Amino acid sequence: MPDSIPSLPDWLSRGMADLFPAGDPSDADQALAARLAQAEKEGRPLRVKLGIDPTGSNIHLGHSILFRKLRAFQDGGHTAVLIIGDFTARIGDPTGKSATRVQLSKEQVAANASTYLRQLGQDQPKETALLDFETPGRLEVRYNSEWLEGMDLPAVIGLLGTGTVGQMLAKDDFSKRYGSGTPIALHEFLYPLLQGYDSVAVNADVELGGTDQKFNVAMGRDLQRHFNKGTQFGLLLPILVGLDGVQKMSKSLGNVVGLEEDPLSMYSKLEKVGDAAIDDYVTLLTDLDLASLPDNPREKQKAMALAVTASRHGIEAAQKAQSDAATLVGGSGDAGADVPEASLAEVNFPAKAFYLFSAVGICASSSEARRQIKGGAARLEGEKITDPNQEFTSAAELEGKVLQLGKKTFRRLVA
């Protein structure tokens, strides 16, 4: 009988948006499955690359879907190669940018990299860490300055010779900027080549990336072929939409859930994710079986929020957050009518947080409101308010939301 056609394990294919090599997706699936089988036969783990440029200081759940897939490879017995782009971060990835990025200093990049590793779980037990830092042979942390900083001019010119201007202008971001007359600095053309060379340097078998990284991941394959290093597979994952359910999760859009948020804040935010986005959140952020979850969107939200919060803080903290959130906003919303209402009719907008608490009668004065907020007693929809000067623009922004002071004082805001 002929050999059965290999297929990808569920942990690998879950949430996958695209897989290189290009062409018939089933062919790519079978090719990667065959490479997995061959690696197992040889007793050799695959080397799975994920590169991150430490251009900021915080990781949110939108970033975490790539790290979750990298962790899945680790748990499957393979080697995660986490590349800290300490060199490329000084150039800045032009992907998705309409203008040249501001270049960062070595000191800024080093500080951000240290923060990233801490958030990924460098000092945490592997049960709640995004990556497994404990099991020998499961993780390599590499800095691309190792091989890029020492490149001499002939090597750089040689690298530039592997690409063309036409190839670079085919990249959507460059094409738009060129068409609109927005300047493109020459060093920006280097970025995809440098990121691609990372795959050569670490002998990657698989590279992970978001769907917005397709050009850069393909460049890695091209450079591996050029340097006779084999060819990596590119496994692309979707871009997670933010809490608004519309735009991608982004700190600048204010629709994020940070990895380091406290359990109650994390759970409360996730419990309000829009119906259209719930299935993606379940698939990309949890190991829950979507088919076994209730059809009721509200129950599905709660299951997802509990699972995500538990993955970061442990099940006991997550269950407590779920219980506390139910107390704050009446659980599923059915008991929400028991929360006293407070009118926004007399509130002058834009309104700062300290003024809002006093204007609706939760605090006796603005000074008391400032003190309570600074003391950590104030929340809106379960999310802690830490800045007394946080500004709210209109009554519509607050309509129907629950304002809380301490453990016993709640007001549902009505316009």
UniProtKB/Swiss-Prot annotation:
Gene Ontology terms for molecular function: ATP binding; RNA binding; tyrosine-tRNA ligase activity
Protein name: Tyrosine--tRNA ligase
The encoding gene: tyrS
Motif ('HIGH' region): 54-63
PROSITE patterns for the chain: S4
Protein family membership: Belongs to the class-I aminoacyl-tRNA synthetase family. TyrS type 2 subfamily.
Keywords associated with the record: Aminoacyl-tRNA synthetase, ATP-binding, Cytoplasm, Ligase, Nucleotide-binding, Protein biosynthesis, RNA-binding
Binding positions for ATP per the UniProt entry: K251
Residue intervals of the S4 RNA-binding domain: 351-414
E.C. no: 6.1.1.1
